Amino acid sequence: MPEADLSILNRVYDIILDRKENYDENSYVCKLLNHRKGMNKILEKVGEESIETILAVRNEDHKEIVSESSDLIFHLLVLLAANNVTLDEIAGELSARHEKMKRD
């Protein structure tokens, strides 16, 4: 199976970081980051997209699994950026876990 080009995750994350610093009233990301509900709004979206992904898997709908998983990952990136968690930190944690599994 060919390896996916995951640089899109970095590009999307960078756009989210830019929206965090540079407010644009037309930006969905800005609306999420500055919502009156605060972090709860972002948490609601992550929860909503998680449930929709689960339902797509339960329904064995490949197209919907891809679509809802993309929504979930996007909203998770917003959540990470809002909490100053970098993709490098996530990659480092995953690498450390992978190395530990190889040793066990």
From Swiss-Prot:
Task: Kindly state which keywords UniProt assigns to this record, in alphabetical order.
Answer: Amino-acid biosynthesis, ATP-binding, Cytoplasm, Histidine biosynthesis, Hydrolase, Nucleotide-binding
What does it catalyze? 1-(5-phospho-beta-D-ribosyl)-ATP + H2O = 1-(5-phospho-beta-D-ribosyl)-5'-AMP + diphosphate + H(+)
A Gene Ontology molecular function term for this protein is: phosphoribosyl-ATP diphosphatase activity
Coiled-coil residues are: none
Alphabetized SUPFAM superfamilies for the sequence? all-alpha NTP pyrophosphatases
Which GO cellular component does the record give, naming just one?
Answer: cytoplasm
Pathway terms, separated by semicolons: Amino-acid biosynthesis; L-histidine biosynthesis; L-histidine from 5-phospho-alpha-D-ribose 1-diphosphate: step 2/9
**Enzyme Commission code(s) on record:** 3.6.1.31
Task: Specify whether Hydrolase is a keyword of the entry.
Answer: yes
What Pfam families would the database entry show? PRA-PH
Compartments where located = Cytoplasm
Gene Ontology biological-process entries: L-histidine biosynthetic process
Q: What class of enzyme is it?
A: hydrolase
* Nucleotide-binding among keywords: yes
PANTHER family given in the database record: HISTIDINE BIOSYNTHESIS BIFUNCTIONAL PROTEIN, HISTIDINE BIOSYNTHESIS BIFUNCTIONAL PROTEIN HISIE
Q: What family does this belong to?
A: Belongs to the PRA-PH family.
**Name of this protein:** Phosphoribosyl-ATP pyrophosphatase
What species was this sequence derived from? Methanosarcina acetivorans (strain ATCC 35395 / DSM 2834 / JCM 12185 / C2A)
